[in-house]
A protein has these predicted regions:
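Long, amphipathic alpha-helical stalk/connector segments used for oligomerization, subunit docking
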Residues: 302-406
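Post-HEXXH active-site segment of zinc metalloproteases
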Residues: 253, 269-294, 308-312
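N-terminal helix-rich structural modules
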Residues: 1-155, 460-474, 481-484
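Short alpha-helix carrying the canonical HExxH Zn2+-binding catalytic motif
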Residues: 252-267
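Contiguous, non-catalytic segments that form substrate-binding/exosite surfaces or channel walls
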Residues: 103-254, 455-457, 461-486
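An amphipathic alpha-helical core segment
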Residues: 423-464
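Acidic/His metal-coordination segments adjacent to aromatic residues that form catalytic metal sites
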Residues: 238-252, 274-283, 338-345, 400-407
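C-terminal substrate/ligand-recognition segments
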Residues: 410-429
């Protein structure tokens, strides 16, 4: 048995090295090319070669029968190996081609849509992809038929999925009312950009100051940031350095948003490589990823520490001026909420609007997966709900298809994860309120320049499990926060 577990670890290590090289390739492609990122199938082809070997097949069938003998870490390794095996097996069944070829085709068609070209040939592939998802999860969950909720439970865990799914559904009407009130009053209270119209150089200076605060968490690695010609931000790390490519520079607020999202990824990288995660499940780690990234994205709304960084670096003569600090903070939070689009990106960066798009994305993905409509109807379903919920016309007639880019990576349930992450931030009230908020310690260390003492451990995860009473506070505090920065 020991020999088999060693073989399993070695095989998974080879796969992880290939994944790392693939990530490196994507990062440097985005760094130098203005075009959307094509799918490089070479790495997946090598993985498919490893998976199709007699050794890999034997290990998979062996540990299917003896998975109870594996440690938690070894179970993670087996899950990774088995996931690749199922991808390869059912891709051949559904697409009549290897998984690498199928994803290459899906990605190429998605890129055509980004360029404004016809994607009519994508829809038959999406029907096949849905069938692929069903077969994969039927085998993985040992069920004859699977529903969308079954998949979410397998990805994020039963307890968290049931709790957040219920409250996401219950909160949709409240979010819609708040959004409509928000857009009705927003134009009349417009705050012009007077101080935050920063140059690319000044923006880089401020972001590096923020990075220095965060870097105390990753003491052994240097963090470097840059702007590239590609609109899609990427992250890459080696043993010495973490590289953050923020994409195209347009303005300070958008750059800050991208930087904070990638900082969330940095914390996750450190978190996943720490010893505390070895005995934790993949479902818990996935949930923590969305929670921490969501939290970092909303930092300008939760603390004035970022405003202090801006004033200290760009306006040093106004360091002690509390009125000036408040003015900058008001300008920052206002425009951080109102920013909508960045060039060719199909995401918006107004947090409230983006949350509502996640509501729509979740609804559509569930109905699509459960076969309530055909893939050809995806764009119509999206456009209908964007107009109904947001009172807006989509900037592209195929936006509803392009929003689900995670499907081209073989991923599902991302919108639910992001919404759950946002909800978890407010589960116990806001950090400044007299409640034990899960991220209070982070903000305390962040504000005091002592972030090196903070780690996102699994005590944090246990605190993020919402209970009924804390949920009742969530909506009230969130509404107060948005009204404050309206």
């Amino acid at each position: 048995m020991e020999r088999y577990t060693q073989d399993l670890s070695l095989l998974v290590k080879q796969i992880e090295l290939l994944e790392e090289q693939q990530q490196k390739h994507y990062f440097f492609y985005n760094l130098f090319s203005p075009d959307p990122n094509p799918y490089n199938k070479a790495f997946e082809e090598i993985i498919e070669y490893l998976i199709s070997s007699s050794e890999a097949t034997f290990l998979i069938h062996h540990f299917e029968d003896f998975s109870h003998t594996l440690s938690i870490q070894q179970q993670k390794q087996f899950q990774k190996l088995n996931d690749y095996y199922l991808r390869h097996q059912f891709s051949t069944h559904c697409f009549h081609k290897p998984y690498s070829e199928a994803l290459y085709t899906l990605t190429a068609l998605w890129i055509k849509g980004l360029r404004g070209e016809s994607i009519i040939t994508l829809f038959p592939y999406l029907n096949l992809l849905r069938e692929f998802f069903h077969l994969k999860y039927q085998k993985q969950l040992n069920m004859k038929e699977v529903k969308y909720m079954d998949v979410l439970k397998s990805i994020y865990g039963v307890e968290l999925t049931e709790f957040y799914y219920q409250h996401i559904k219950e909160s949709k009407a409240s979010f819609l009312r708040l959004y409509r009130d928000y857009i009705e009053t927003f134009p009349s209270e417009y705050i012009p950009i007077q101080h935050l119209n920063l140059s690319k150089e000044d923006t880089m200076t401020v972001l590096y100051d923020i990075i220095r605060i965060a870097q105390s968490v990753i003491s052994k690695q240097t963090i470097l940031i840059n702007f590239g010609p590609n609109p899609f931000p990427t992250i890459y790390q080696n043993e010495e350095t973490i590289y953050l490519n923020l994409g195209i520079f347009t303005d300070f607020v958008s750059a800050l948003n991208q930087c904070l999202k990638l900082l969330g990824e940095v914390f996750i990288l450190d978190y996943n490589h720490s010893a505390t995660t070895d005995d934790k499940s993949e479902t818990e780690q996935r949930f923590m990823k969305h929670s921490i990234i969501g939290f970092c994205t909303l930092l300008p709304l939760l603390t004035d520490s970022l405003t202090k960084v801006i004033v200290n670096r760009i306006f040093p003569d106004n360091k002690g001026d509390s009125a000036f600090l408040e003015k900058i903070h008001e300008e920052l939070t206002f425009h951080y909420f109102k920013t909508n689009k960045v060039h060719n990106s199909i995401e918006s960066y107004q947090p409230l609007q983006e949350m509502l798009k996640y509501f729509i994305e979740l609804e559509i993905e569930e109905e699509w997966f459960d076969k309530k409509f055909d893939s050809l109807d995806l764009s119509h379903q999206w456009n209908l709900r964007i107009e109904q919920y947001l009172n807006k016309t989509p900037h592209s007639h195929v936006e509803g298809v392009l929003r689900h880019s995670n499907w081209t990576k073989g991923e599902i349930g991302v919108a639910f994860g992001k919404l759950s992450g946002y909800f978890s931030i407010f589960c116990s009230g806001l950090p400044k309120e007299p409640y034990d908020h899960p991220f209070s310690e982070f903000l305390e260390h962040f504000s005091g320049g002592k972030l090196r003492w903070w780690r996102p451990n699994y005590q944090l995860y246990s605190k993020l499990k919402m209970n009924e009473e804390s949920y009742k506070c969530c909506w009230v505090f969130f509404k107060q926060k948005i009204n404050h920065f309206r």
